[in-house]
């Protein structure tokens, strides 16, 4: 809460205070104790902070300062842990939290250079914990020479009965900074190392900083848990270079990634401190025994009198996009997956490996889960493989190179995309379909939140919005149901959703009359036993916290984030009613577009007194691209005055953002939600400089890594508290940040198709949203990343915005990469003479991007069956699927968002009617082929 004080006064005008409480606690416009607000926030997380113990780090003894080719390194003299790690190419910037040293100087706080172990001398006995941060004493400085900057015996920091002696050295090795540990067995018997962790402490401390300070000073770090090929990348929040890459050097295989237990517990402005696990068997046998690890756990025995050296190196990349190039330049193994690391079973995926030793073996686990076929190397020697997923779920490839280097790549095998989405729709409209005419909250009929563990609808939760069709945690399921129909309509499902619109949404969740007409309630469910004396609230739930809104609170209309969900539902059904025959029967298309327009207008307009009706609308909203979609369709329909009205409202917001350094404010102190809509409107109004700030921010928190869970995974770590069953602060793998942030990433790629990095992260996020869908169609809110868990959450929660991002983005991208040649993200490629033939296999098959031509083909109705590109003439042939009972015409839009030298405007080579900026193409009982050319 305390780092957004600059916004609190503004938000209080809407009846909210900042931070978590802005999202969840309505308040009167009176003086309210901020301490009470903070206490309520902390009570949800159960993370009230105790005062730190006395300092033991030894800062009063001063610092040691060193100059390396890449860094200015400062060590605390007494501990020889890092006080600062400053890249020379970014004066004034520090990857470590040097400005928080005094606050983190007590026992229990970790610093770069610490080490943790579990050891034993009896192979069946208990593990002994060794931890250099637990009880600090000044280390014993050792003489140095040559390339060694500093060296110390860590014995004073270890228990007196430690069976090992640890020597730590800071070394410059071939011009690169290295951290080395020598572990020596002091005993007369073997010492087993069951766990060895290297704390990775970098500046992710957003607490107490405003957005500008956070983006300029802070970094996020993402692990590639990949054994010897693994690494940790540390990237600045502003998305600019340089980026730090921590890589294994000697014996430091990256096996697991663990949250450290520090006095300052994780919260919304501090994700926590983590350690790189080199060995983890002792945890795998105990705390992690119920989890399926990313890597097979290891342990090691050190014989009497023997020593083992572990070391890591610190590399510097000039920018985030060049991390892979930096790894290659430093002879590190690099993997590039196309389309990523999610494998639909009908897709031929590609894997390219850059490492000078050849691969000696490739093993898929579970056996047969992935079929691997070796291909010819690329022209510059990348080793190439074609992959086909065979067994649904998590899988991994374990690679061994001829020099003994090991690499693991974790994949997720899904059903074919169209089948996965069909399963999602079926589950939503059967298992999650709620019908109870006696429901006192007016939720029937609807698609409601679901508990997969209990196999039942969540009809009650003390976080009332989850059971009340509100917020993201309660709206998620019906939102996913709506946008699923947009791209994969099914009449039986549409009939049910029409009932939801007429019986629950319009007039229930959304007011249909009175002064709040078009306002969206925060929740239909609420906790008010006095209002409902005959309703039995589950006594096992805690109804005493601020999350259990009373009826007046639930009826509030002030949370702007609730409105895009409603607009998305109306817009999806407008598109269906307008472009298909006999799918939508309860209202004409005009009604749906009018509802989308009126809801948008209400969201952003002001009351007669000049105040906002709805809070947070000066911020970027999740799914905010939907408002641009409504505006575009208002224009196409010739509803000019209404379009101008919406445009005026949006320009007021964009003009405001243009004046802000980092216009990504949120109901949270830092968030990854506003960038999507800020990018869209800044591009629309020509504020390209501010759009670039948005895109750079996304690049800062949305990595590409050889791992299905982290590739394209936009950073989110607190929403298990609000939409999950297992409630805690934890990095969420493929929460809705993945799908939503992929929208601007891919939009930017379509304008700059030579920026392969944007395609990697954008498509990774788009595909990530499919992994949430299980074999029966249930979609989880997100995957738990802690090594003790590593499983999907039991609640459906706020998956809906994630699927919105997928639905808004899903497409087949055809590229001609300078190294990898012709490839397709979301389809299969076949070379046939002069022709490159692509079978689209994405979820909807309604969008194709041909990168060499900068050509963006989209369908308002119909689907693509094939795209063929002539490499000599550059003609593009479009194959359209046969007509069906709902689709007699395809409506094709031809756009060229990228300006590519030598490429003229594409248009159909036969005369076609144009309606609403789309070519109307009559379909037949067989595939219809349309040829596009520039002449």
Segments predicted by a language model, with ranges:
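Acidic-aromatic substrate-binding/catalytic surfaces of carbohydrate-active enzymes
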Residues: 54, 59-160, 207-283
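Low-complexity, Pro/Ser/Thr- and charge-rich linker/hinge segments at domain boundaries
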Residues: 206-210, 325-346, 407-449
């Amino acid at each position: 809460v305390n780092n957004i004080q600059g916004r609190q006064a503004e938000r209080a005008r809407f009846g909210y205070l900042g931070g978590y409480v802005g999202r969840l606690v309505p308040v009167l416009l009176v003086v309210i104790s901020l301490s009470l607000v903070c206490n309520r926030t902390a009570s949800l997380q159960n993370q009230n902070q105790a005062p730190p113990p006395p300092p033991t780090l030894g800062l009063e003894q001063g610092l040691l300062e060193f100059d390396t080719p890449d860094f200015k390194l400062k060590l605390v003299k007494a501990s020889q842990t890092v006080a600062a790690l400053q890249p020379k190419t970014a004066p004034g910037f520090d990857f470590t939290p040097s400005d928080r040293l005094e606050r983190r100087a007590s026992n229990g706080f970790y610093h770069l250079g610490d080490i943790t172990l579990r050891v034993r001398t009896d192979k069946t006995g208990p593990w002994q914990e060794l931890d250099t941060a637990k009880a600090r004493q000044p280390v014993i400085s050792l003489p140095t020479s040559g390339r060694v900057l500093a060296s110390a015996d860590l014995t004073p920091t270890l228990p007196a009965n430690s069976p090992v002696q640890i020597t730590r050295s800071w070394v410059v090795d071939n011009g690169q900074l290295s951290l080395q540990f020598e572990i020596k067995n002091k005993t007369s018997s073997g010492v087993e190392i069951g766990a060895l962790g290297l704390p990775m402490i970098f500046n992710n401390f957003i607490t107490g900083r405003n957005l500008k300070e956070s983006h300029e000073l802070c970094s996020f770090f993402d692990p590639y848990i990949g054994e010897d090929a693994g690494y940790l990348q540390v990237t600045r929040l502003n998305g600019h270079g340089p980026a730090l890459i921590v890589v294994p050097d000697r014996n430091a295989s990256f096996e697991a990634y663990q949250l450290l237990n520090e006095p300052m517990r994780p919260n919304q402005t501090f994700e926590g401190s983590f350690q790189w696990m080199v060995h983890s068997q002792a945890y795998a046998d105990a705390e992690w025994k119920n989890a399926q690890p990313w890597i097979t756990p290891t342990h090691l025995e050190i014989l009497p009198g023997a020593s083992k050296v572990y070391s890591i190196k610190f590399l510097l990349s000039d920018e985030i996009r060049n991390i892979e190039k930096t790894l290659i330049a430093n002879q590190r193994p690099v993997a590039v997956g196309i389309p990523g690391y999610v494998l639909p079973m009908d897709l031929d995926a590609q894997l390219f490996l850059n490492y000078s030793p050849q691969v000696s073996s490739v093993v898929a686990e579970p056996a047969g889960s992935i079929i691997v076929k070796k291909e010819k190397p690329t022209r510059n020697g990348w080793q190439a493989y074609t992959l086909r997923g065979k067994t649904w779920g998590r899988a991994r490839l374990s690679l061994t190179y001829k020099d003994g280097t090991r690499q693991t790549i974790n994949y997720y095998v899904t059903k074919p995309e169209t089948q996965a989405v069909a399963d999602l729709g079926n589950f939503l409209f059967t298992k999650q379909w709620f019908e109870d005419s006696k429901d006192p909250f007016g939720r029937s009929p609807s698609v409601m939140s679901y508990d997969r563990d209990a196999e039942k609808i969540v009809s009650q939760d003390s976080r009332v919005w989850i059971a009340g069709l509100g917020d993201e945690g309660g709206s998620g399921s019906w939102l996913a149901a709506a946008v699923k129909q947009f791209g994969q309509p099914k009449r039986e499902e549409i009939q049910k959703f029409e009932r939801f619109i007429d019986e629950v949404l319009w007039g229930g969740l959304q007011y249909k009359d009175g002064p709040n007409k078009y306002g969206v309630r925060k929740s239909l469910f609420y906790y008010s036993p006095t209002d409902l004396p005959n309703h039995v609230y589950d006594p096992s739930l805690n109804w005493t916290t601020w999350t259990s809104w009373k009826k007046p609170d639930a009826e509030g209309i002030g949370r702007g984030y609730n409105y895009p969900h409603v607009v998305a539902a109306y817009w999806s059904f407008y598109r269906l009613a307008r472009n298909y025959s006999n799918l939508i029967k309860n209202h004409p298309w005009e009604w749906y577009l009018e509802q989308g327009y009126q809801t948008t207008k209400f969201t952003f307009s002001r009351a007669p007194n000049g105040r906002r009706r709805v809070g947070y609308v000066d911020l970027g909203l999740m799914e905010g691209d939907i408002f641009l979609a409504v505006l575009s369709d208002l224009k196409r329909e010739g509803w000019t005055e209404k379009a101008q009205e919406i445009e005026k409202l949006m320009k007021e917001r964009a003009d405001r953002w243009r004046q802000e350094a980092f216009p990504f404010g949120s109901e949270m102190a830092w968030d990854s939600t506003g960038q999507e809509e800020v990018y869209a409107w800044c591009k629309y109004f020509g504020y390209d400089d501010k759009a670039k700030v948005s895109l750079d921010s996304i690049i800062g928190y949305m990595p590409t890594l050889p791992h299905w869970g982290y590739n394209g995974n936009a950073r989110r770590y607190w929403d298990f508290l609000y939409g999950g069953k297992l409630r805690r602060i934890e990095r969420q793998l493929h929460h809705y940040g993945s799908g939503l942030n992929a929208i601007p990433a891919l939009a930017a790629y379509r304008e700059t198709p030579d920026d392969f990095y944007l395609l990697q992260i954008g498509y990774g996020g788009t595909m990530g949203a499919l992994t949430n869908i299980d074999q029966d169609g249930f979609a989880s809110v997100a995957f738990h990343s802690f090594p003790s868990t590593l499983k999907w959450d039991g609640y459906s929660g706020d998956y809906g915005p994630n699927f919105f991002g997928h639905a808004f983005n899903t497409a087949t991208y055809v590229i001609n990469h300078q190294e990898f040649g012709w490839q397709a993200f979301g389809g299969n490629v076949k070379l046939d003479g002069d022709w490159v033939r692509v079978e689209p296999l994405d979820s909807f098959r309604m969008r194709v991007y041909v990168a060499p031509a900068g050509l963006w083909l989209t369908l308002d109705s119909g689907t693509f069956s094939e795209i063929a590109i002539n490499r000599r003439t550059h003609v593009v042939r479009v194959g359209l699927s046969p007509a069906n009972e709902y689709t007699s015409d395809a409506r094709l839009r031809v756009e060229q968002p990228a300006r590519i030298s030598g490429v003229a405007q594409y248009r159909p080579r036969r005369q076609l009617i144009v309606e609403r900026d789309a070519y109307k193409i009559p379909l037949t009982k067989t595939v219809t082929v349309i040829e596009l050319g520039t002449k």
